[in-house]
Swiss-Prot record:
Keyword Cytoplasm assigned: yes
HAMAP family (UniProt xref): Asp_tRNA_synth_type1 (MF_00044)
Source species of the chain: Francisella tularensis subsp. holarctica (strain LVS)
Entries under InterPro entries matching the protein: Aa-tRNA-synt_II (IPR004364), aa-tRNA-synth_II (IPR006195), aa-tRNA-synth_II/BPL/LPL (IPR045864), Asp-tRNA-ligase_1 (IPR004524), Asp-tRNA-ligase_1_N (IPR047089), Asp/Asn-tRNA-synth_IIb (IPR002312), AspRS_core (IPR047090), GAD-like_sf (IPR004115)
GO biological process: aspartyl-tRNA aminoacylation
Known partners and oligomeric status: Homodimer.
Location within or outside the cell: Cytoplasm
Gene name as annotated: aspS
Region (Aspartate): 196-199
Residues annotated as site: Important for tRNA non-discrimination: 30, 80
Catalytic reaction annotation: tRNA(Asx) + L-aspartate + ATP = L-aspartyl-tRNA(Asx) + AMP + diphosphate
Superkingdom of origin organism: Bacteria
Name of protein: Aspartate--tRNA(Asp/Asn) ligase
Record keywords, A-Z: Aminoacyl-tRNA synthetase, ATP-binding, Cytoplasm, Ligase, Nucleotide-binding, Protein biosynthesis
Length: 590
């Protein structure tokens, strides 16, 4: 039907006859001449119909979002009427004929006025929202990114192999989406949270290099960067080590950013241990564009009478830190400090102490804060020296249980960085390594990544003889601008070590056999050293397109309650279907 897309129409086609198809984006009547902006996925082109044209009445009857096909001759626009904002802006099409393919009702919101439209409305009419050039750009970028990744992995010897969607429920952290079996009454499949076990089994099978662009499912509480169904770039390889995975993935991600948005990353990426990340930034996914670091002042506060600081300073499970904001006296108002105090409270902090440094020459008198009177001058100036604080700087303090301080002050660091625009570069990719093997909660051990991550031991004897809380894992995360975009590890390839890890996690031998018997069996049949990584496609595209909402980069996303406003999923099903599955629905008591 068409000969050209809108973006193809330029001055090189002057005098040529073309056919375009698309939507009427805008219609204008100037002195009896009809101007139509025709939109397709590549952009806009201007179509002009003069009153003496046989199709003038048809052109005059067009309204926004009518779908049309038009023929005409490409002409240079009159001098001074060029539009530099569109690729076809130097030319226009003088219309010969036009055909209305389909009319449109008045759309629920104007594409140019989307910011004043509620997200619920945009999600209900997603097919309208996706007509916006901004949304089309994001999904086109997604397509380009996935194409690049496929080509890279194909060219590096990885095989695209599909794994099952109907699989066995296994305890991986989040709740599974369950699918009842009609043939096996009372039994359920689970939609996979990841292809973890299947990709490891492919390594046992000898495929050596695997990848898959795959949907995964987690029935968990949602936030701005989470969806119940999401897409992973899933990768696994045999006879390799951490260095192979990290260097190969650096090349892939650096190439991806250069190919899609023209950004060049220096390689190799910075590498930081988990312990350093937590110590300096309170987070295992720090945004290194923000030049703010924690300074540990625990020892300095141990002998002070100020219990807010000395209490945590003498508690092995707590920490005391300072965070210096250069020029913070002028940049941060009292109102902002009050807001930050409320902000850290979200993470469990009981308050937010601060000191304004007005004058260093005046000693304690030059420091402004409600807490200054409670701390000795010697200690105050030790802290000032440690933090390299200068006049007009402001110091924030975190004191309390280690997790609360890390979470609250880590979040505060990121918020201040954004509020004051402290970013000293556009991009900051890094690897975080040497994660703890386990984390403890409610007096029980949990896998920090997943139960198949290899510990940094060579034998089951080493595993038995090491305090589990001191074990490091062979895991690695890729972080870009404070987002964890990918995570992986070298896997356990020996059956006895895998069985012992299950045991340390409180999984009995019987439960391990029931849930993972097939995996334990496979590990006894000659399993190679192997490892891999998975990247969140949705998060990567968020970074590539500069959005903070994951729903912007998915064609048909769910809401934060995991519903689809357009199709009204989830929905009820008939009693007949439920009976076939042997399911009775228990009505929620109100």
């Amino acid at each position: 039907m068409r000969t050209h897309y809108s973006s193809d129409i330029n001055e090189k086609l002057q005098g040529q006859k073309v056919t375009v198809c698309g939507w009427v984006h805008r219609r204008r009547d100037h002195g009896g001449v009809i101007f139509l902006d025709i939109r397709d996925r590549t952009g806009l082109v201007q179509l002009v119909f003069n009153p003496d044209n046989d199709n003038f009445k048809v052109a005059d009857s067009l309204r926004s979002e009518f779908v049309i096909k038009a023929e005409g001759v490409v002409n240079l626009r009159p001098e001074g009427q060029e539009n530099k904002n569109i690729s076809s802006g130097k030319v226009e099409i003088i219309g010969d004929s036009i055909e209305v393919i389909n009319k449109s009702k008045t759309i629920p919101f104007q594409l140019d006025d989307f910011q004043s439209t509620g997200e619920d409305v945009k999600l209900k009419y997603r097919y309208i929202d996706l007509r916006r050039p901004e949304m089309q750009h994001k999904l086109i970028t997604r397509s380009k990114a996935i194409r690049y990744v496929r080509n890279f992995l194909d060219n590096n010897g990885f095989l695209d192999i599909e794994t099952p969607f109907l699989t066995k429920a296994t305890p991986e952290g989040a709740r599974d989406y369950l699918v009842p079996s009609r043939n096996f009454n009372g039994k359920f499949y689970a939609l996979p949270q990841s292809p973890q076990l299947f990709k490891q089994l492919l390594m046992v099978s000898g495929f050596d290099r695997y990848y898959q662009i795959v949907k995964c499912f987690r029935d968990e509480d949602l936030r701005a960067d989470r969806q119940p169904e999401f897409t992973q770039i899933d990768i696994e390889a045999s006879f390799i080590d951490e260095a192979f995975i990290m260097s190969t993935m650096e090349r892939m991600i650096a190439g991806l950013f250069k190919e899609t948005i023209g950004v060049e990353f220096a390689t190799p990426f910075q590498v930081m241990t988990f312990a350093d990340a937590i110590d300096k930034y309170g987070s295992d996914k720090p945004d290194l564009r923000i030049p703010l670091e924690f300074v540990n002042i625990k020892e300095d506060m141990q002998n002070e009478e100020f219990k807010v600081f000395s209490g945590p300073a003498n508690d092995p499970q707590s920490r005391v830190i300072a965070l210096r904001i250069s020029g913070g006296n002028d940049k941060l108002t009292r109102k902002m400090i009050d807001e930050y105090t409320k902000f850290v409270g979200i993470y469990g902090a009981k308050g937010l102490a601060y000191i304004k440094i007005n004058s260093l020459s005046q000693g304690k008198e030059g420091l402004q804060s409600p807490i200054v009177k409670n701390i000795s001058e010697e200690t105050l100036f030790k802290v000032i020296e440690k933090t390299s604080a200068k006049e007009d700087d402001l110091l924030f303090f975190g004191a309390g249980k280690t997790k609360i301080v890390n979470d609250s002050m880590g979040a505060l660091r990121a918020k201040i960085g954004e509020d004051l625009d402290l970013f000293n570069k556009d991009w900051a990719p890094l690897w975080v390594v040497d994660f703890p093997m386990f984390e403890k909660d409610d007096n029980r051990l949990y896998a920090m990544h997943h139960p198949f991550t290899a510990p940094k031991v060579s034998s089951v004897e080493d595993l038995v003889n090491t305090n589990p809380e001191e074990l490091s894992s062979r895991a690695y995360d890729m972080v870009i601008n404070g987002y964890e975009v990918g995570g992986g590890s070298i896997r356990i390839h020996k059956q006895d070590i895998q069985a012992k890890v299950f045991n340390l996690l409180g999984i009995s031998d019987d439960e391990a056999r029931e849930k993972f018997g097939f995996m334990l069996d496979a590990l006894s049949y000659g399993t190679p050293i192997h490892g891999g990584i998975a990247f969140g496609v949705d998060r990567l595209i968020m970074l590539l397109t500069g959005t903070t909402n994951i729903r912007d980069v998915i064609a048909f996303p769910k809401t934060q309650t995991a519903s689809c406003l357009m199709t009204e999923a989830p929905s009820t099903v008939s009693l007949e279907q439920l009976n076939e599955l042997g399911i009775a629905v228990k009505k929620e008591e109100r």
